[in-house]
Amino acid sequence: MSANCVSAAPTSPKNSDVEEIRKSATYHSSVWGNHFLSYTSDVTEITAAEKEQLEKLKEKVKNLLAQTPDESTGKMELIDAIQRLGVGYHFTTEIQESLRQIHEGQIRNDDDDVRVVALRFRLLRQGGYRAPCDVFEKFMDDGGNFKESLKKDVEGMLSLYEASYYGIDGEEIMDKALEFSSSHLESMLHNISTKTNKSLLRRLQEALDTPISKAAIRLGATKFISTYREDESHNEDILNFAKLDFNILQKMHQEEANYLTRWWEDLDLASKLDFARDRMVESYFWSLGVYFQPQYRTSRIYLTKIISIVAVIDDIYDVYGSFDDLRSFTDVIQSWKISNADELPPYMRICFEALLGIYEDMGDRIGAPYAIDTMKELVDTYMQEAEWCYTEYVPTVDEYMKVALVTGGYLMVATTFLTGINNITKKDFDWIRNRPRLLQVAEVLTRLMDDIAGHGTEKKTTAVSCYMKEYECSEMEASRELSKQVKKAWKDLNDEWMEPRSSSAEIIGCIVNMSRVLHIMYSTGDDGFSDSSTRTTQAVKTLLVDHPMN
């Protein structure tokens, strides 16, 4: 929303200058156009030979997992490789049982090796176990700092660095681990020869850019496959299994992108509503980041369609609609009746009809009513932000966040995705509808990431502008303080992930994974959804366009 506001209390809407500002936003056209129409059935067909080979390799990897003792460092390294290669979903039961054994045993024979201790800690916390952080105390000196001698161990530093991102609020030792390891790795980065240590240089850059805890699994796998291939101790069966699985899934995802492109072209919203963002492919990338596995196809389809339409609705409220039209649009969506749409301008009616069509496709799924309710709530808060804009009102940070956490769309997105999963129950939807702590934390995290990245690039009210106004500070000071809240939110997500969990791992994973994909879009300081011509485009290209792994 427009940030050209003053700190007066809300009054009646004004016309004139504010409306002109609201109509000034411009967005680049779709980077992809109809590119994915080229992925026809003959291109995306998965052959019988591929399926047979995948099953053979899967059995070999499964046997390897069974034969490697849980009491060994090799078992932890095996689990880590399988998960980072993106194929852990094939062995969920086996990995969970191994981690249970490791947790119960809390093996101590390698306690003097920081690499192994950090790896064990990370794997257990990734698996939901509250592994104690005091295992790192033996690596501290009398002054309470990590021993300088650890800096000689590059692999140990990398392992400690990755583990440090699984800390929770109040774990001072994990904060020290992050500061110690990251500063040393950054120093190493500037001193490594690009000629003699290309592999290590790339690993350091990738780790510092996106630690494992914040990485979307599928994107992380594309990078780790190359790293694993270069490891002299790699297992050829695991490597071949990961590459084949990636290629098969890529075909599935290309077919989905083809279907969605045809759906989007049939709607023709991009030409009918040319003031709005055309971001269908970026919306699919978002849904792919939540869950990429084959069984979540329906959820990805629902979510991609909804995000694509919501981007247009958001632009109607932010950019194009007059105040009176926005009020009418809000009322019609609250009624959820197509018969009431006759009073709307044509461009709003087109959008409303498209929105209704998606929810009609959900039929009698348990989550459909919940998904509709969250959409109504989202639009209602869009209207609240529009009123702020038209009355030139700058809310306090608390006022802003109460509304902005909803306009961020996190609950709507999560509910929509879960609607496509058959085994999600009414109890599950009631739980998430009540906004549990996990969801609140994720909403704060992504809202602030978006606002910090977007402040100054668009004429919008953000948490940064509200903080600057309320606390009379500079943009840098406001961003610094809000960034502290982002760091705490990541820790709180870790806390919610670990046992005892408030819901199933599948639902919690959905919410956490959404934060990871949004981290990709916003972590460079840019809005990677609205301006998708940079990092997001490369991510889409990596997952959906680049040639298969070989």
Swiss-Prot record:
What range does the record give for the signal peptide? none
List the ranges annotated as motif DDXXD motif: 314-318
User: A GO BP term, please?
Assistant: diterpenoid biosynthetic process
Q: Which reaction does it catalyse?
A: (2E,6E)-farnesyl diphosphate = (+)-beta-selinene + diphosphate; (2E,6E)-farnesyl diphosphate = alpha-selinene + diphosphate
Q: In which pathway does it act?
A: Secondary metabolite biosynthesis; terpenoid biosynthesis
Enzyme class, one word? lyase
Asked if the Swiss-Prot or TrEMBL record annotates the protein with the keyword Lyase, the reply is yes
Protein known as: Selinene synthase
Q: Which organism is it from?
A: Ocimum basilicum (Sweet basil)
Q: Which gene encodes it?
A: SES
